[in-house]
């Protein structure tokens, strides 16, 4: 009998010794629960509820305003007659339903419900432990050596003081392994073997269970804490850290709950943290033993052209679009970076070849120019996705192929889900018989080929990577000789030997790259600037600003009229256009100094010898450049005559317009790219062309070739109509 009395005494001595050792550092993940927003402890299943089949199961309901309030009560079990394992938030009735069970429990079934969201406490459904496993509430009931656990409420064969009533909130239920005091070794239990009092259980660390391939772009596991133990912030929450990665904006990135993800091409998955002082950290996810990507995740490798966004490009082009050589990926000079071959083993970062390791718009590289960190390799041609077997004639309005992916790699969404949007920008009833499934089509007679809607709110639609059939000469614009003006886009150039201008140029935009002027642009709507693709050497939009209402490129004397706006999105023009529509973070305020310029009508032409003007802050040919906006006067030249001036080396097509200088040596140069060729007709000024990098700078008897805005007018109007913009 003395043995049974001595064991509790020894256990009490052990407990007292443990209490003396308690004041040690507790990891953030296990010691900061009071600071946490408890909604992060739950796995969310949208549009789902639980229906109890067993009538004996209890449910508690109450009116609440938010799911966060439901989570707080469930976590604390405040006012609940049971241990809460899950809850459902009824969004329509603003009501919470708390459950002592979850979707894994018997006597319960899942059911779809548009107004419901199901939240299940992760601790009850997780099959691994974090840290010491203090929060583990799974159902493992066997020790490491295979002995069955003794129930916590039983004193046979071992007496103990770890009673469920003494450890409320520790879930000492049944005979499940637990670690109520957070001791070293992880969850444990008293055993059913009289010879072995207690033993730890063999429950793996979550970091051992989870694994990723490559850099984890396709990782969709359940890791929800960082490598230092910090709990991740939910992707659908903006506290404590505001961010852009909202699940509804990026439906293909797997932004479920607060699980680690890699949406932006980092070396490995990461997350925002609940620590207000630590914005984000990487997650400790090991590489899978079979470090090969699934077939659905592997981009098609190409060497001569790019497909989609060029993530599979493995060619040897090693300069950016303007000829600047690329920096070696394994070098940190002149630009330091973490895009090294060691960090991105699956991305073929050899030598200094153009690559797209982070899912950017197209292949790129760091440059050897210390002043230009990054540049796109946009000179690499796009592949025909169907290798010549799938093509369209004319503008593709009769295309009936089976391609269902956009040029940027997004999967097309079903046409029948987008008919309301389609009716907003066409004035006739589309032929529904042609709009099969989610195949690329051209129901609105778009001049630039088949397209489709996407599931991405930021890119509601885009063109498909289908080429015109070889030898097809069907014009995509009819009545090209009609004397009406059309729409435009711009590129960056500098006006050489122009005269200063001040009046009626409120639509001129100075695009700034790291606070220095790099390109011109035209304000065509309060939230949209038309400019050139070559104006964006960096992929980071935070590097850019738009200055409006200025005359001096440095802003001197323009303080009262200058507006400085951030850039929120770049929408690239149809294939080969070199155009970009730049969306501003907030609308420009139209006043005496800032105004918009009109677009021409689609497909129109302007008569030869019409006097037009180009504007810009680029290279002037003057030693002491004063930084003022300049204008140079040009006249429209026919395509045939323009080709003669270029000694037959240039053949202009329907997407280009030519203009020669009235004054020898005048014209656009570097720094003016993206700016407008402005013409007037019927007392209306409009942007007819966009300045793009040409063949030399203001060369005598060498007219300039511009992007013809009229050819792309419908595309511009379609973007403005269908893309969401911020409200003023």
UniProtKB/Swiss-Prot annotation:
This is Hepatocyte growth factor. PANTHER family: HEPATOCYTE GROWTH FACTOR, PLASMINOGEN-RELATED. InterPro entries: Hepatocyte_GF, HGF/MST1, Kringle, Kringle-like, Kringle_CS, Kringle_sf, Pan_app, Peptidase_S1_PA. Coiled coil: none annotated. GO terms for cellular component: extracellular region; extracellular space; membrane; platelet alpha granule lumen. Glycans are attached at residues 294, 402, 476, 566, 653. Residues 495-721 form the Peptidase S1 domain. Belongs to the peptidase S1 family. Plasminogen subfamily. GO terms for biological process: cell chemotaxis; cell morphogenesis; cellular response to hepatocyte growth factor stimulus; epithelial cell proliferation; epithelial to mesenchymal transition; hepatocyte growth factor receptor signaling pathway; liver development; mitotic cell cycle. The keyword Ligase does not apply. The keyword rRNA processing does not apply. The gene is HGF. Gene3D superfamilies: Hepatocyte Growth Factor, Plasminogen Kringle 4, Trypsin-like serine proteases. Potent mitogen for mature parenchymal hepatocyte cells, seems to be a hepatotrophic factor, and acts as a growth factor for a broad spectrum of tissues and cell types. Activating ligand for the receptor tyrosine kinase MET by binding to it and promoting its dimerization. Activates MAPK signaling following TMPRSS13 cleavage and activation. The modification Pyrrolidone carboxylic acid is found at residue 32. It is linked to Deafness, autosomal recessive, 39: A form of profound prelingual sensorineural hearing loss. Sensorineural deafness results from damage to the neural receptors of the inner ear, the nerve pathways to the brain, or the area of the brain that receives sound information. Keywords: Deafness, Disulfide bond, Glycoprotein, Growth factor, Kringle, Non-syndromic deafness, Pyrrolidone carboxylic acid, Repeat, Serine protease homolog, Signal. Residues 37-123 form the PAN domain. It comes from Homo sapiens.
């Amino acid at each position: 009998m003395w043995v049974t009395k001595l064991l509790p005494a020894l256990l009490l001595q052990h407990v007292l010794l443990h209490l003396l050792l308690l004041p040690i550092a507790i990891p953030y993940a296990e010691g900061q629960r009071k600071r946490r927003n408890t909604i992060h402890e739950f796995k969310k299943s949208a549009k789902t509820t639980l229906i109890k089949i067993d009538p004996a199961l209890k449910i508690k309901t109450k009116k609440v305003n938010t799911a966060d309030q439901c989570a707080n009560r469930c976590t604390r079990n405040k006012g609940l007659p049971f241990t809460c394992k899950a809850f459902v938030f009824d969004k329509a009735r603003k009501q919470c339903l708390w459950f002592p069970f979850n979707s894994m429990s018997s006597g319960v079934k899942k059911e779809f419900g548009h107004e419901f969201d199901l939240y299940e406490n992760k601790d009850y459904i997780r099959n691994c432990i974090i840290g010491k496993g203090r929060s583990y509430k799974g159902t493992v009931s066997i020790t490491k050596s295979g002995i069955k656990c003794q129930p916590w409420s039983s004193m046979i064969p071992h007496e103990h003081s770890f009673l469920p009533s003494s450890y409320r909130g520790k879930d000492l239920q049944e005979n499940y392994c637990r670690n109520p005091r957070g001791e070293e070794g992880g969850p444990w239990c008293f055993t059913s073997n009289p010879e072995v009092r207690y033993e730890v259980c063999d429950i793996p660390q979550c970091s051992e269970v989870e694994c990723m391939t490559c850099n984890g772009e396709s990782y969709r596991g359940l890791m929800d804490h960082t490598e230092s133990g910090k709990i991740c912030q939910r992707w659908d929450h903006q506290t404590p850290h505001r961010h852009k990665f909202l699940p509804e904006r990026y439906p293909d990135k797997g932004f479920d709950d607060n699980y680690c993800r890699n949406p932006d091409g980092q070396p490995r998955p990461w997350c925002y943290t609940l620590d207000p002082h630590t914005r984000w950290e990487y997650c400790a996810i090991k590489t899978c033993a079979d470090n090969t990507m699934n077939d659905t995740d592997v981009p098609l490798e190409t060497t001569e052209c790019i497909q989609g966004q060029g993530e599979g490009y493995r060619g040897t082009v090693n300069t950016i679009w303007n000829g600047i050589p690329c920096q070696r990926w394994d070098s940190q000079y002149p630009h330091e970076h973490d895009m090294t071959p060691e960090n991105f083993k699956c991305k073929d970062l050899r030598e200094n070849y153009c690559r797209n390791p982070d899912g950017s718009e197209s292949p790129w590289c760091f440059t050897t120019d210390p002043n230009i960190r990054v540049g796109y390799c946009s000179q690499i041609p796009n592949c025909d996705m169907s290798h010549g077997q799938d093509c369209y004639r004319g503008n593709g309005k009769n295309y009936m192929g089976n391609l269902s992916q956009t040029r940027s790699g997004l999967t097309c969404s079903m046409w029948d889900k987008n008919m309301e949007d389609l009716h907003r920008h066409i004035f006739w009833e589309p032929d529904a018989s042609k709009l099969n499934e989610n195949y690329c089509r051209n129901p609105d007679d778009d001049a630039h080929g088949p397209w489709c809607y996407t599931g991405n709110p930021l890119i509601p639609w885009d063109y498909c990577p289908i080429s015109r059939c070889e030898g097809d000469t069907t014009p995509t614009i009819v009545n090209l000789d009609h004397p009406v003006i059309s729409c435009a886009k711009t590129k960056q150039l500098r006006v050489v030997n122009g005269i200063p201008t001040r009046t009626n140029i409120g639509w001129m935009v100075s695009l700034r790259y790291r606070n220095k002027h790099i390109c011109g642009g035209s304000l065509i709507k309060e939230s949209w600037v038309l400019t050139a693709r070559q104006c964006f050497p960096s992929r980071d939009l935070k590097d850019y600003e738009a200055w409006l209402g200025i005359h001096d490129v440095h802003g001197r004397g323009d303080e009262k009229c200058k507006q400085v706006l951030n850039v929120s999105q770049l929408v690239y023009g149809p294939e080969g256009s070199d155009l970009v529509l730049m969306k501003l973070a907030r609308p420009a305020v139209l006043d005496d100094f800032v105004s918009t310029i009109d677009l021409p009508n689609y497909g129109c032409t302007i008569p030869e010898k019409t006097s037009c003007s180009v504007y810009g802050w680029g290279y002037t040919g003057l030693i002491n450049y004063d930084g003022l906006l300049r204008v140079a006067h040009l006249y429209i030249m026919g395509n045939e005559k323009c080709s003669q001036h270029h000694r037959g080396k240039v053949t202009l097509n329907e997407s280009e317009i030519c203009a020669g200088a009235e004054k020898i040596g005048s014209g656009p140069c570097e720094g003016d790219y993206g700016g407008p060729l402005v013409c007037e007709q019927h007392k209306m000024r409009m942007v007819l062309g966009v300045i793009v990098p040409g063949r030399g700078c203001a060369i005598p008897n060498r007219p300039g070739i511009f992007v013809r805005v009229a050819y792309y007018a419908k595309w511009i109007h379609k973007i403005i109509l269908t893309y969401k913009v911020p409200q003023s």
